[in-house]
């Protein structure tokens, strides 16, 4: 009977350890770190509320920095899906009621702009810069995607501008509906019923 090849077996084990200690182990270590950080981070605090609007049910949410989300014409569960599942939700708070009160005034024609702290920190720097420019468009006016790109010093970026506006988490308050295509067509709109909602808002403001 042959003796076991101990030296050869040890070499195989050493080689396997070498393979496992490479990229695979690094990925696993990074994943464990992310999971630990996720559980260590305090669950976000979010206040949310809803109201009936001419565009359907409207939902608003506030975090510690300010208004962070508005959606309308959809179901509440779809609205809540955008938040961290660990979020601590509080409904119908005073902070949310202030937002809803201003929105009611807007829909009734008593208000054309908003005085609210907002939080768009989850967006990229480019997306935030696009929304900052959109906030400069006065009620009753419309700008084109091209003009916003030019205002940013990137005249060829009209398509990325449209993509950034589509990710606006706070429609109406940040008036992405005031941006249209260069040919005069409305272009897209991520809020509510899409272009129909955009058309309704522009008519409310006297732009159409």
Residue ranges and their predicted role:
Residues 1-156, 204-208:
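Basic nucleic-acid-binding alpha-helical/helix-turn surface characteristic of O6-alkylguanine DNA
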Residues 156-200:
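Short glycine/serine-rich loop segments
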């Amino acid at each position: 009977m042959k003796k076991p090849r101990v030296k050869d077996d040890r070499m195989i084990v050493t080689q396997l350890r070498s393979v496992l200690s490479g990229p695979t182990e690094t990925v696993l270590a990074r994943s464990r770190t992310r999971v630990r950080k996720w559980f260590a981070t305090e669950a976000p605090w979010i206040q949310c509320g809803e109201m009936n609007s001419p565009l359907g049910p409207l939902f608003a949410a506030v975090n510690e920095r300010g208004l962070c989300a508005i959606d309308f014409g959809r179901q509440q569960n779809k609205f809540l899906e955008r938040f961290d599942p660990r979020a601590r939700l509080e409904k119908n708070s005073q902070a949310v009621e202030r937002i809803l009160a201003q929105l009611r005034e807007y829909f009734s024609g008593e208000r054309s702009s908003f005085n609210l702290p907002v939080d768009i920190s989850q967006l990229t720097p480019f997306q935030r810069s696009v929304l900052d420019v959109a906030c400069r468009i006065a009620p009753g006016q419309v700008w084109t995607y091209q003009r916003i790109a030019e205002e940013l010093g990137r005249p060829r970026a009209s398509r990325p501008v449209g993509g950034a506006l589509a990710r606006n988490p706070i429609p109406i308050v940040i008036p992405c509906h005031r941006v249209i295509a260069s040919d005069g067509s409305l272009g897209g709109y991520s809020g509510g019923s899409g272009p129909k909602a955009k058309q309704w808002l522009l008519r409310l403001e006297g732009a159409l």
